[in-house]
Amino acid sequence: MRSSSLAWALGLVALANAQGSPTQWYDSITGVTFSRFYQQDTDASWGYIFPSASGGQAPDEFIGLFQGPASAGWIGNSLGGSMRNNPLLVGWVDGSTPRISARWATDYAPPSIYSGPRLTILGSSGTNGNIQRIVYRCQNCTRWTGGAGGIPTTGSAVFGWAFHSTTKPLTPSDPSSGLYRHSHAAQYGFDIGNARTTLYDYYLQQLTNAPPLSGGAPTQPPTQQPPTTTAPPPPPPSSTFVSCPGAPQPRYQMNVANGFRVAPVLGGLTMPRGITLDTRGNLLVVERGRGLTGHTLDANGCVTSSKVVIQDTQINHGIDVHPSGRRIIASSGDIAWSWDYDPATMTATNRRTLVTGMNNFYHFTRTVHISRKYPNLFALNVGSDGNIDVPTRQQNSGRAQIRVFDYDQLPQNGVPFVSQYGRVLGYGLRNDVGITEDRAGNIHSIENSLDNAYRMVNGQRRDIHTNNPAEKVYNLGDPSNPRAIFGGYPDCYTVWEPSDFTDSPKQPGDWFTQDNSGQYTDAWCNANAVKPTLLLPPHTAPLDMKFGLGNDTNLYVALHGSWNRQPPQGYKVVVVPGQYSASGEWSPTAPLAQSRTAWSDLLTNRNENQCSGFGNANCFRPVGLVWSADGQNLYVSSDTSGEVFIIKRMSGPIVQPPITQPPITTSPPTPTTPPVVQPPTTVAPPQASQTLWGQCGGQGWTGPTLCPANSVCRESNQWYSQCVPA
C-alpha cells in the first residue's frame, strides 16, 4: 500500500504548477458559452457555468463539461484544487454512453465513491469518433466539509484537473468503477465571477434539450420533391395524438406531409401574428389589435389555459423572449419596447422604449430577433415605403434594411432607428419579415420581393410578374460584426422563371433589373449586390422561418401568400433541406440555380386555388413559426383565420431528455476505510502496446512499454513514464 499511495501522491505533485486560466468559450455544438480551461498537451477541456449570485448567495450547483480525444480513458477534476478532502468528479464514455461519478480521497490513494453531489448527464454528451464529452449538472456541489470547504461565490478559486490518456476504468459500464491512476494532472485558478451568468437557466434548458453527441453520417434531409409523390412511407407513430381537447375544428381543410399530424390548438384569436415560446414552454402570441396573450401547454403541446400578458393595441407583429427568460421585446410599426417578464406567472412589467422612428404606411410590421449567441444584441427590420422605394439605395434612408442594437448600450428613453446605435446588418432588403439564427449565431432573413414586375425589351414593357421575381433568403452574417450587406433593392431582383427573359439568357438566381439600361443594369447588380442563398416561388410572401432542432437540419418557412398572382400560390408551410458546417453555419443542400425544386410541402390548404390575398383569404395563411424545445411540435399562426396549429412529428421528439444516473448512496470514506480499488501497479492495462500519451514505464509498472510510431517513452519521475511525440 505504501507504493500505491506514494505513486498517487507524486502524480499529484504537478498540482502545484498552475497551467493558465479559463477563458470564455463558445461551444458551437450547443450554442452555449462556458468558462473553459484548455490543456494543450492532452487536447482536453474543462468547462464551467455558474448561476448568478443574488444578495451574496448563489444556488449550490453548476454546469460542467469534460471534453477530450475519443481515445482518452477518463477525465476528472477536483472542485477544491487538491486531491485530498475535496469532491472529485470523474467522467468517461463507455462505447457511446457517457458516465460520471463523484469521488472522495482522504489520502493520496485511489478515491472512493462520494454520495454528496447529485449528478445529471445533459445533452450533447457522448462521442462522435473524434472527441468524447460529458456535459453534466452538479447539484449540492459548491459547499462541503474539509479541504477548501467549497467554491466561493465571487473571487478566485483553485480547481484541479486529472486525465488518463488511454485506459478506461476497470468496469467502464459502472459509474462507480475503480480507476487507473491519471497520466496527467495539474491545477489552475480562475475568477468564479467570470463564470457566473444570468443566462444559467437558459443554458441549462439548451443543454437539457440538446441531442446526444454521436458519430456516423448525419440524418438525411427530406426529399426535395413534394412528399405527395416521392416521400418515403411515414415512420410508425410513437404517439396517438389526433387533436387537442377543447380546441375548435380547423376552419379550412388542410393536408400535412407524411410522418406528421396537424390540429388547431387555438381558434377565435384576433389576427395572430408573431409567436414564440418562453423558457417554461408557454406559448406567446401577438394578436394584432389586442396585445400579447400567453397560453400554457400540456405534455401533448395542447393549450390548457390562456391569459392576456400585455394589453396593447399598438403591438402588431414582432415578439421575442430573451434567452434568460426574463425579458421580452415587442414592437408596433413605429416603436420597439422591452418588458421585464416572469415566465412562471406570464406577467410583463416595466415597459421601456428601445427604438423609435420606424413608421411607414406601406410595410408596417417589424420583426424582433434577440441573438442567442449574443443575448445583448437584437435585430429589427423596417420594410420599404412603397413597391419601389428609390431612397433605400442609401443606408441612411432607414428603410428596406435590418439593424442590430445593443440593449446594454441604449439610453433609458430609447434611440431613433437611424441613430448610430443601430448598426446596419443588411440593406437593399425590400421587406425581410422573417429573421432567424443558425447554430453559429449567423442571422438569416427572407425577403418579400417586388410586385408587378416587368422587363423593358426593345423599348417595350413586358409583364413578367406572374413568375418573377423570386422570394429569397440571405445570410447576413454575424450580428456582433455587422457588414451592411447590400441585397440589391430597389434595382436588383432575382430570376425565378428564365423563359420570361427574351433579351438575354438567364437561369434561376441571376440578377435582373426592370430596365436593363442606364446606371442600374444586370451587370451593375452582379458587381454590387450580394446574392441570396436560397430562392422560393414568387408572390408566396414568406413571413417567418425557423431551423429544425437536433438532427433536423432543414429550414421551415411560413408562406403567407400574396394578392399579386393568379393562380395564387403560397398559403402553406414548406421545408428546405440544408446542412451545417463544422462551425454551425447553415446553407441549403441545393445550389442557388436549383432552388426551384429544392423544397417540399409540409402543411398546405386542401385547395390552394381558392385562396385569396384579400379579406378572409378563403384559407389559412401561415404567419409565425416556433418549435417546441424537444423538436416534436411546430406551432403555426394563421392571422386571417384566427388560429394557431400544432404540427406534430409522429416519430416523437428528436431532442432527447438528459440521461440521469440513479443516486449514489455509498457513504463518504472515513480515514480508516481501505481503498476500494487495487492500485495500477498490480493491474496491467489490457493493451499489448501503448498509445500516444499513455503510461509506458515506471517503478512497479507491468503494463505495455512499447510506444506507437513517431513517439518515445519519456520518464516524468521514478514512478511514471509516458509515450510522447518524438
Curated annotation (Swiss-Prot):
Record-listed Ca(2+) binding positions: 449, 451
Pfam family, one: CDH-cyt
CDD domains: CDH_like_cytochrome
GO cellular component entries: extracellular region
Residues annotated as signal peptide: 1-18
Domain of life: Eukaryota
Binding site residues for heme b: 83, 108, 181-182
EC code(s) of this entry: 1.1.99.-
Biotechnology: applications noted: AA12 family proteins are an attractive component of cellulolytic enzymes for use in biodegradation and biomass conversion or as an anode catalyst for bioelectrochemical applications. Moreover, direct electron transfer (DET)-type bioelectrocatalysis of the PQQ domain from PDH has been used to create an amperometric L-fucose biosensor for the screening test of cancer using urine.
GO MF terms, alphabetically ordered: cellulose binding; metal ion binding; oxidoreductase activity
Matches recorded under SMART domains: DoH, fCBD
Low complexity biased stretches: 679-689
Residue ranges annotated for the CBM1 domain, each copy included: 688-724
Primary site of residence: secreted
Keyword Cell inner membrane: no
Positions of glycan attachment: 140, 551
Cystines in this chain: 138-141, 244-302, 492-525, 611-619
Transmembrane segments: none
Note on domains (UniProt): PDH consists of three domains: an N-terminal cytochrome domain (found in AA8 family enzymes), a PQQ-dependent dehydrogenase domain in the middle of the sequence, and a C-terminal cellulose-binding domain classified as a member of the family 1 carbohydrate-binding module (CBM1).
Family: Belongs to the sugar dehydrogenase AA12 family.
Protein's job: Pyrroloquinoline quinone (PPQ)-dependent oxidoreductase that catalyzes the oxidation of various sugars including L-galactose, L-gulose, D-talose, D-arabinose, D-lyxose, L-fucose and D-glucosone. Shows significant activity toward the reverse-chair conformation of pyranoses. Shows little or no activity toward abundant sugars such as D-glucose, D-fructose, cellobiose, as well L-xylose and L-glucose. This enzyme is able to direct electrical communication with electrodes, without artificial electron mediators, thus allowing direct electron transfer (DET)-type bioelectrocatalysis.
Name under which the protein is recorded: Pyrroloquinoline quinone-dependent pyranose dehydrogenase
